[in-house]
Amino acid sequence: MKAVFTFILSFFVAYFGFGQEKTLLFSIKGKDTKPSFLFGTVHMIADTAYYFPTKLEKTLGKADQLVLEIDNIGDRAKAQKMLLLDSGNVFDQFTPEQADSIVQWGSSLLGMKPEAFKKSFSGMKPFVLVQIGVQAMMNAHSKSYEMDLMSKAGANKQPVRGLESMESQFAIFDNLKPEVLTEMIMEGIRHPEKAAETQQELVALYVAKDVEGLAKLIVESEDIAGSAEELLYRRNRNWIPVMTDYMKTQSCFFAVGAGHLGGDQGVIQLLKDAGYTVTPIAY
């Protein structure tokens, strides 16, 4: 589960050859495409670590449109519907002992009575149980880069697009082997301190703008190794032709989880492999 926390928050150490300065912002240039930008986000972060300087805002303003990971990310009704099981009870997917541990853990985190927790979450997918842990680590003063970017794009009258559908992102967790997801959840319950430690490492690397360090942390997480193809690499590959199509007609500001950028199978390298020039921008 530590890996899932990392993936959700990455969000998810080498030098790029431009001095000691590191960055999460890059320009993208290629033949027959409009000059565009790539920015690495972390989906939720404490407001004390949040950094959105004027230069970043001005760079967003140079683009014709904002492109996030998920299309229609603001459709809360659709997202909530996709969190529901088609049928059955989520707690039936666990042994009685595991289900009891989940109920005690979740009700304690959320300040609910065990029976109320069980009733409220029985119709939810297992992925929602992961989200409980994520939300527990976030305080009331957390901020979201995606939400802020959408707000600024709206003020600029820039359209907001996505690299993949909401259905495809939810399918990532729907398609994980049940035993893999179960172990992720139970590991988080057994060792909550590990997830907290990983979050601290993740935030430190993000604040340091260390794209390669973030990729390394995520991929080397003990739980994610067997699922890196589904959680990261396949999505990265699928995004490149979509990015190309967008850039043929519009200058884009692409904003995706920073954990997707680094490494030999990260978005930066895949763009270079596709013939693009990707240049770091200090901000």
Segment roles from a protein language model:
Residues 1-26:
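Bacterial Sec-dependent N-terminal signal peptides
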Residues 11-12, 43, 259-260:
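Short, glycine/serine-rich, charged loops/turns that create anion-binding
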Residues 20, 48, 234-238:
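Short secondary-structure boundary/capping elements
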Residues 23-24, 52-54, 240-241:
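A generic local structural motif
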Residues 27-37, 42-223, 230-231:
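Structured, acidic catalytic/metal-binding patches in enzyme active sites
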Residues 226-283:
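A cross-kingdom marker for long, charged
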